[in-house]
Amino acid sequence: MGEEIKYSRFVKTDYQQYQKRLQQETDILAEWFSNNALSKKGLVAGYELEAWLIDSNASPCPRNEAFLQRANNPYLFPELAKFNIELNVEPQSINSSLLSDFEKQLQQLWQQCKQTSKDIGCNMLGIGILPTLTNNDLSLDNISSLDRYRALNEQVLRHRQGKTIGLNINGNEHLEVERKDVMLEAAATSLQIHLQTPQDESVRYYNASMIVSAPLVAVGANAPFMFNKDLWYETRIPVFEQSVDIGGIGGAASGPMHRVTFGSHYARESLLECFNENLEHYPVLLPVTYDTEPEKLNYLRLHNGTIWRWNRPLIGFDDDGTPHLRIEHRTMSSAPSMVDNIANIAFYYGLVHYYATCIDPPEARLTFAETKDNFYRSAQLGLNHRVIWPDGNRYTIKELVLDSLLEEAQTGLDKLGISAADSQRYLGIIESRIESEQTGTQWQRKFAELNGRDMQRLTRCYYQHQQNNIPVHEWDFDCSGPHIA
């Protein structure tokens, strides 16, 4: 969904033609899998970070078009709402300095974004859900002025046959709201970690990504509040799942195949299973026309981009044109500081490599149903919720991280060749965060407990701390720092 489209109005024949081409491209991909023709290149890392533009009142600042024009940076992109943007980095092969390189690149890009946002009368903020966000902020007046977003909105409503889109979230409190557009999706901003894998290793990495999603969603949580309600430990999860809920083939909006999903099973033989599932169970959402040869897989890739698995397989191409597989891990919020984002990335890469390469595959010892339940319960309940692990025992997320996962992540990073200094630094941040139980979510909840449910004050204090780029476990509740301009 990151690519602009040409759009006017879709008619029945557009869907028929798109479906035909989607079948053709899925067949081509199946042939590539069968012939082992996908890239055998070593692991390649990358990530995307979604962020907010806010004004001097800590409310959304819907000026991403002016921001992007002024920044003139190919690594910055618009998002669904005019007050959101996305930061990208250049993917790179995993090497000893990967993590520190990522941090330097992110710091440089973030500094440019901060200055550019000030130049247009806004400020930059990284957070999972903006606490000051209101339902009125999510009006269609604030949808980004790109055809793909207008088309997405119209097509989601078309598939819902005009029925409103609603949130019904039970957490510490209850939130129920309905809208006639897809703008609820813009409430949730995330860190999306990419890992390109060789074809013959992709099943293990994909399944490992699913298994480690439960601890990662809790460790990286930074979104407890939505519309002044304290909901899940990571409220992004139900918000995003419900905001584009149109179901699968036949319009079964309450059926088993949701557009935003944890998935329906582990990968068994290959990641082709996900693309076959896309073809068979998900109706075409954006039936645009491309003037490209089928081997570019434009139709397949766009269709896959309108299905938001929390661990999403992607097809791309190496510089020499060889098709490759990537896994996009989408469970974690945009973090309280840039160094927290890199620590989260380190924890993911270390854990996923450890579990993808261990001799005894963990997916053979933990059912998919257990893995899925672990994920949703962790997203709702956080660090002190118990999950079942492949060894057959139950642990709280806190126990699991401190007693085994940090050591396993360290082993994984060592095997990847990450420098000891970097792995110790970033995993040390995770360790301190979990020992103190001060995740982004917990800091926000504690602030509200100490100061009342004043979302503007909370956001101002959060913004002040974010300017210092110190990890969230070191944050206090003193708001005497630099104010939002």
Residue ranges and their predicted role:
Residues 1-485:
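Phosphate/nucleotide-binding catalytic core
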